[in-house]
Amino acid sequence: MVLKTIEDNCKSQFDDDLVEDFNNFQTTSSMSSSTTISTEDFNTIEIESTFEICRSGSYTEEPILGENDEFLIDFEMERFLKFLKDKTKQVEKRKEPFSQKEIYAVFQRRIKSELCIETVKKKFQPLLPNAIQTCEFDEETMIRMIYGAGIRIDSVDFWNRFTSKATISLDCYSRLISYSSDSLTLSGTHRSGFTYHWISTPPVTYHRTENKDPNIQEPSPVEFLDVQSSLGSSMKPPILDKPTKLDDPAETRHDCSYSLEEYDSQSRMPRTDAKKSNHKHKYCYEMNSNPRGTVLILSNENFKNMERRVGTKQDEVNLTKLFQKLQYTVICKRNLEAESMLEAIKEFAEMAHTDSIILFLLSHGDGAGSVFGIDDMPVNVMEVSTYLAYHQNLLLKPKWVAVSACRGGKLNMGVPVDGLPALEDKCAPISKFWNLMMSRIMPGTFTSLNADVIISFSTTDGFTSYRDEEAGTWYIKSMCKVFNKHSKTMHLLDILTETGRNVVTKYENVQGNVVLKQAPEILSRLTKQWHFSRSM
């Protein structure tokens, strides 16, 4: 019997209230009286938390449900519904808000089995809006309640229901969208060769909102360029002073002002005419601020122990000219140590009040996803993107992190490259500093969705990135060329994909019979199209 199992195994931790609750539930439920819970199953429950709940009637943040214990889930749901009903009767008499541990904790159960997840969602989803509305939770608790159990809500319906009766800011709503069933919260796609595949990055399964307007077109899949190198890992790099090009002698120009005639008119990439497209469409980011956005360029040339990055100044010039032309404010900071780079990024995020932001990281890099300060200390690119994604000033705004650096130790000894053969274990002080920064804007523990962020790399993971000492890097030079040609007719993903095509097909190092190539890569979490012409 259930009661006997509890009494035999947990006498020291449970009081008469728990036994009475189990007894009442078993009597009123449709479950057979012969149902038992084995000692092994019952031990999966965190007894202390369950005891506290039953004794005080106050829900804690600790999980109390065991894996695959459907009976215990039903029992807990029954208690919770009764608890909520009793509490809501006291709303008018109670002046202060309910404790954040009340009700919220049930939504944050760390349940592993699909059965448990579906049961929780089925029981709680209809209850969630009323619980939030009635109990007047603060915004942070509201977000955690929805995120904790992986419950998807219709964000539009949520906004309409609660703006009139509950205090909720736009910032809070924008974070809720990240965890809602809104179809704009795309998990992204993966490109393997020329085949596109959906990938799932959120902590719960991607879900499309039901009963959507059939006339609304789904956003097109995000392109992820992943071109494999044709060279084997044992291939010796040639000795070559400067990169050469397959065609177009005019490519030797070192500025980013390119004419129509100089551009490859036979490009096979699809064009998206920004003038003809509907910029009021929900799948285009707003670009109406003046200035249109802010660009921060962190450019490191002189390092403590690594090779000097000759040519990075030309990248700075090309990028500054380009984005000033696109009506962006450009800030360039040179030769920073790793901690100073993080401080600069923090200041950049806090001062950004435009419709979009762009961060360029021009430095040496490694295969661990980091770029280096001039003190040879690493800054993790993914942590930077996470910081920007969750910053209050940047919610719902498109954010682009562009990295021009090596991503591995496959070095070309004859061509200057942005890389480091090996990374020593020097990152602890920087990680500590970074965690402190993150804790100030990300209370609690969340799995990052990196919504509205796109990261572009100059090369594929594991390979080097090439740089001309006079003209700058292949990647930045090609990117500026494509932007000057197509910034009014392409959105950002098309521009970056065309940039990748140019680098792959038009640049190479040749020494005898050996050909070295470079393939840029894109990782996108954008939820809309990013155009660089003003919204109409």
Curated annotation (Swiss-Prot):
Lineage: Eukaryota, Metazoa, Ecdysozoa, Nematoda, Chromadorea
Biological process per Gene Ontology, one example term: positive regulation of cellular response to gamma radiation
Post-translational modifications reported in the UniProt record: Autocatalytic cleavage removes the propeptide and generates the two active subunits p16 and p14 in vitro. Cannot be cleaved by ced-3 in vitro.
MF term (GO), any: cysteine-type endopeptidase activity
Reactions catalysed according to its record: Strict requirement for an Asp residue at position P1 and has a preferred cleavage sequence of Tyr-Val-Ala-Asp-|-
Phenotype reported upon loss of the gene: Survival of touch neurons and several pharyngeal cells is not affected during development and no extra pharyngeal cells caused by impaired apoptosis are produced. Basal and ionizing radiation-induced germline apoptosis are normal. In a ced-3 n2427 mutant background, more animals have the M4 sister cell that survives. In a csp-3 n4872, csp-2 n4871 and ced-3 n3692 mutant background where the canonical apoptotic pathway is impaired, 16 percent of animals have still 1 or more cell corpses that are morphologically apoptotic and are internalized by engulfing cells.
Pfam families: Peptidase_C14, SPK
GO CC annotations on file: germ cell nucleus
Positions annotated as active site in the UniProt record: H364, C406
Family label: Belongs to the peptidase C14A family.
Tissue distribution: Isoform a: Expression is restricted to the late germline pachytene stage of meiosis I in both L4 larvae and adult hermaphrodite gonads. Isoform b: Expression is restricted to the late germline pachytene stage of meiosis I in both L4 larvae and adult hermaphrodite gonads.
Subunit structure and binding partners: Heterodimer formed by the tight association of the large subunit p16 and the small subunit p14.
UniProt protein name: Caspase A
Keyword Protease in annotation: yes
SMART domains cross-referenced by the UniProt entry: CASc, SPK
